[in-house]
């Protein structure tokens, strides 16, 4: 076995159907008394429900989170938290809402309690991202790692099936890249493979019955593991491309992961054959890139960048940006090869 470094940095996790009932207990355990509740506009009713549970412990609701965390919105949210005298942020929703909480925490140090309603996994990481003038800047900082995460599968029952699958594939992307990370280790590998298996196994019954609470629990469990590995090791080409394309063209986050993942894995497959075998085994397919592409296509999800609204002329810019700053990846970053990858992803070509 090769030498490795393992360091655990994970939040307190409260998991189970009905776990939202423990919200007040968990806020008290954090030592907080003045919570600002965050959500997207679409989940403002959920935010109001959370504020109602908190009662006097809630000082306001900020229902304006949006994908890729525009820097102007982050500033406004920080000012609102300061104006209200908030001593913590409670983020209910997906990665956009957790991301806004992180943007607040990065400057203010406010602790975050996250209540995920998708499978994004951001709640388990010290990774933040903000978008300024079409460029998404990401980084790692211990201040943005949520203090506590409440995983309540009942809160995912209303997640539309297309979003369920795309969010699940987003989570699988985290685990897939961790399996060939240069700083990976055996513990992370076990968590990643189990996370992929749990989500993959849950998606089929959920497509038949989106209200299957057992499958919802399995998917959320898998998302927890996939998010944890995202926060523990470095990501490669897939995540770089998604951050580049998402920030530059304002493309939907989960669907973008769905489109890019099969092609990024195909690009790396010759240099990461063991990782590809583990991903395929966890999903019960013969080929990881083709298996993930086929799953998305069967589920009626977009499988091309064109379908997401990206302009074809953006391919050259994206290829330039993808190789601008070196980062670890199993296969060397070759601009022409990445341009071909992007062309295939743009046209929705099934990986060979």
From Swiss-Prot:
Pathway the protein contributes to: Xenobiotic degradation; (2,4,5-trichlorophenoxy)acetate degradation
The keyword Oxidoreductase appears for this protein: yes
Reactions accelerated catalytically: 3-oxoadipate + NAD(+) = maleylacetate + NADH + H(+); 3-oxoadipate + NADP(+) = maleylacetate + NADPH + H(+)
Family under the similarity heading: Belongs to the iron-containing alcohol dehydrogenase family.
Taxonomic placement: Bacteria, Pseudomonadati, Pseudomonadota, Betaproteobacteria, Burkholderiales
Listed name of the protein: Maleylacetate reductase
Gene3D superfamilies: 3.40.50.1970, Dehydroquinate synthase-like - alpha domain
Keyword Oxidoreductase part of the UniProt annotation: yes
GO term, biological process aspect, one: 2,4,5-trichlorophenoxyacetic acid catabolic process
Keywords from the UniProt entry: Aromatic hydrocarbons catabolism, NAD, Oxidoreductase
Enzyme class: oxidoreductase
Enzyme Commission (EC) number: 1.3.1.32
Pfam families from the UniProt entry: ADH_Fe_C (PF25137), Fe-ADH (PF00465)
GO MF terms, alphabetically ordered: alcohol dehydrogenase (NAD+) activity; maleylacetate reductase activity; metal ion binding
SUPFAM superfamilies noted in UniProt: Dehydroquinate synthase-like (SSF56796)
Disulfide bonds: none
């Amino acid at each position: 076995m090769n030498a490795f470094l393992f360091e655990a940095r994970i939040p307190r996790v409260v998991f189970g159907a009905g776990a939202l009932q423990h919200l007040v207990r968990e806020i008290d355990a954090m030592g907080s008394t003045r919570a600002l509740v965050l959500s997207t506009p679409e989940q403002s009713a959920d935010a109001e429900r959370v504020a109602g549970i908190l009662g006097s412990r809630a000082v306001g609701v900020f229902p304006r989170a949006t994908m890729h965390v525009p820097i102007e919105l982050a500033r406004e949210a920080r000012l609102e938290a300061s104006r209200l005298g908030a001593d913590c942020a409670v983020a209910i929703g997906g990665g956009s809402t957790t991301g806004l909480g992180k943007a607040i925490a990065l400057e203010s140090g406010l602790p975050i309690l996250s209540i995920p309603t998708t499978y994004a996994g951001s709640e388990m990481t010290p990774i933040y991202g903000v978008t300024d003038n079409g460029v998404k800047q990401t980084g790692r900082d211990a201040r943005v790692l949520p203090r506590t995460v409440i995983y309540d599968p009942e809160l995912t029952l209303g997640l539309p099936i297309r979003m369920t699958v795309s969010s699940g594939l987003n989570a699988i992307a985290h685990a897939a890249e961790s399996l060939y990370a240069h700083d990976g280790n055996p513990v992370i590998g076990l968590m990643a493979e189990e996370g992929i298996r749990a989500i993959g196994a849950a998606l089929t019954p959920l497509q038949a019955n989106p209200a299957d609470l057992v499958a919802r629990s399995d998917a959320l469990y898998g998302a927890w593991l996939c998010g944890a590995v995202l926060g523990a090791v470095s990501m490669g080409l897939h995540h770089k491309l998604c951050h580049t394309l998402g920030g530059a063209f304002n493309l939907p986050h989960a669907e973008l992961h769905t489109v890019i993942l099969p092609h990024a894995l195909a690009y790396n497959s010759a240099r990461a054959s063991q990782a590809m075998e583990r991903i395929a085994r966890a999903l019960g397919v013969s080929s990881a890139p083709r298996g993930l592409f086929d799953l998305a296509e069967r589920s009626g999800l977009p499988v091309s960048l064109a379908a997401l609204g990206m302009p074809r002329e953006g391919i050259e810019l994206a290829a330039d940006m993808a190789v601008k700053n070196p980062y670890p990846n199993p296969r060397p970053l070759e601009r022409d090869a990445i341009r071909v990858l992007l062309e295939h992803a743009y046209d929705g070509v099934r990986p060979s």
